[in-house]
């Protein structure tokens, strides 16, 4: 089979799929982030989408991908509990980069969820996972389906957490190709890119936040903390979008 045959890859077990993509990933590791985006647009199937949480370093991947695909749909899963600074940052970047923003939300409003389940994020790992399934995973699955996505760009980096340390440039997740063009970047490379292109960090960066999600499960970084400890009370790093 062709290693870029999405249907055939989806029929394989996870380990076999990774093996089938190993040679391609070895080639992609040697490319720049810009070249990885170009390669994906030329070799992977459309429709293409880009997801963003509009977090601390979100401007990097948003700028990187839209420089080559200006009209790519940008998927935001909005929980309704983002920081006010995040919503303003979304507006700012959407205008600055002329983003084709697609906002997806849970079918139940935040108030309805609290009435039905209570504050899920205060109910341990199981509650957090249920909250994430409702507010992140289901809306993302719906977005991928409605936008007919076959290739998904995301801005994950290996040095963000242990759960991301071994991710490849190219994989298959939720039935679509997933490409991570800045997977091997460090904080210095991110800073240099932002400076070069006149882009900003999320406003809360200057207040001591290394990672930003919902108001109720995000903490400022303090000396001695790992970055993943600033999210979900240190119980989880991933919100569910990038698992599986």
UniProtKB/Swiss-Prot annotation:
EC number: 1.8.4.8
Entries under Gene3D superfamilies matching the protein: HUPs
GO biological process: one example: sulfate assimilation, phosphoadenylyl sulfate reduction by phosphoadenylyl-sulfate reductase (thioredoxin)
Pfam families, sorted: PAPS_reduct
Top-level division of the source organism's lineage: Bacteria
Main location: cytoplasm
GO terms assigned for molecular function: phosphoadenylyl-sulfate reductase (thioredoxin) activity
Active-site residues annotated for this sequence: 239 (nucleophile)
Oxidoreductase among keywords: yes
Keywords: Cytoplasm, Oxidoreductase
Function, in words: Catalyzes the formation of sulfite from phosphoadenosine 5'-phosphosulfate (PAPS) using thioredoxin as an electron donor.
Name assigned to this protein: Phosphoadenosine 5'-phosphosulfate reductase
Organism: Cronobacter sakazakii (strain ATCC BAA-894)
Biological classification of the source: Bacteria, Pseudomonadati, Pseudomonadota, Gammaproteobacteria, Enterobacterales
Gene of this entry: cysH
